[in-house]
Curated annotation (Swiss-Prot):
Entry protein name: Large ribosomal subunit protein uL18
Similarity remark: Belongs to the universal ribosomal protein uL18 family.
Role summary: This is one of the proteins that bind and probably mediate the attachment of the 5S RNA into the large ribosomal subunit, where it forms part of the central protuberance.
A GO term for molecular function: structural constituent of ribosome
Cited CDD domains: Ribosomal_L18_L5e (cd00432)
Signal peptide: none
Organism: Dechloromonas aromatica (strain RCB)
Domain of life: Bacteria
Subunit structure: Part of the 50S ribosomal subunit; part of the 5S rRNA/L5/L18/L25 subcomplex. Contacts the 5S and 23S rRNAs.
Higher taxonomy: Bacteria, Pseudomonadati, Pseudomonadota, Betaproteobacteria, Rhodocyclales
Keyword annotations from UniProtKB, A to Z: Ribonucleoprotein, Ribosomal protein, RNA-binding, rRNA-binding
Keyword rRNA-binding: yes
Gene Ontology CC terms: cytosolic large ribosomal subunit
One Pfam family it belongs to: Ribosomal_L18p
InterPro entries in the record: Ribosomal_uL18_bac-type, Ribosomal_uL18_bac/euk
Amino acid sequence: MFNKKQARLRRARKTRAKIAELKAVRLCVNRTNCHIYAQIISPCGGKVLASASTLDTDVRKDLANGGNKAAATTIGKLIAERAKAAGIEQVAFDRSGLQYHGRIQALAEAAREGGLKF
């Protein structure tokens, strides 16, 4: 049977396959214990159009900890800003098989407040 990681990766593959059928720009989110990452990826070719993470130097100055909801909210607002600068309004949310809860939810809500539609 599956262990926890294999089940998450399976969910991620299924989601990415559905997004690929739509041919939509996707907002891909990844998290670790200490950091959170967000990338806007083009539908064809997998090219990164915009990105933000808690590892960015300008973000690190403002945050004491990169692995909490406050950091996720900051990254959500920043990725929405950078997406608008790249001319992107509509995205598909790819949560990488992670549960829509906690830091993932905080990032998504902040991105929506920043003007991204998904």
